[in-house]
């Protein structure tokens, strides 16, 4: 395994700690990417897919109220994301 794509930044930080416990170096031996853009990720140099969790939560609450009141709701919502490259990922090794 050369990379981990975690469902959250917290899980990604756990993967980094587990890799270190196993003697694996991040990013030399294992690249790690999280999702959220959590502030703690900046402290540990975590590459992340940043998203606006506050806006998503706000919109979810409004949608729930609309559903309770019988109002029509969209089938899906799409939010912008941004790849924030930090020190937990490395380029693909030649020949890999």
Regions found by a protein language model. Give the residues of each.
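Flexible loop/turn connectors
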Residues: 1-95
């Amino acid at each position: 395994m050369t990379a981990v794509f975690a469902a959250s930044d917290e899980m990604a930080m756990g993967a980094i700690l587990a890799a270190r416990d196993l003697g694996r170096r991040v990013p030399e031996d294992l690249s790690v990417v999280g999702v959220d853009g959590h502030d703690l990720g900046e402290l540990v140099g975590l590459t992340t897919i940043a998203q606006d969790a506050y806006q998503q939560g706000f919109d979810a609450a409004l949608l729930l109220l609309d559903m309770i009141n019988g109002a029509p709701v969209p089938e899906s919502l799409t939010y912008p994301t941004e790849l924030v490259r930090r020190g937990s990922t490395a380029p693909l090794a030649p020949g890999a």
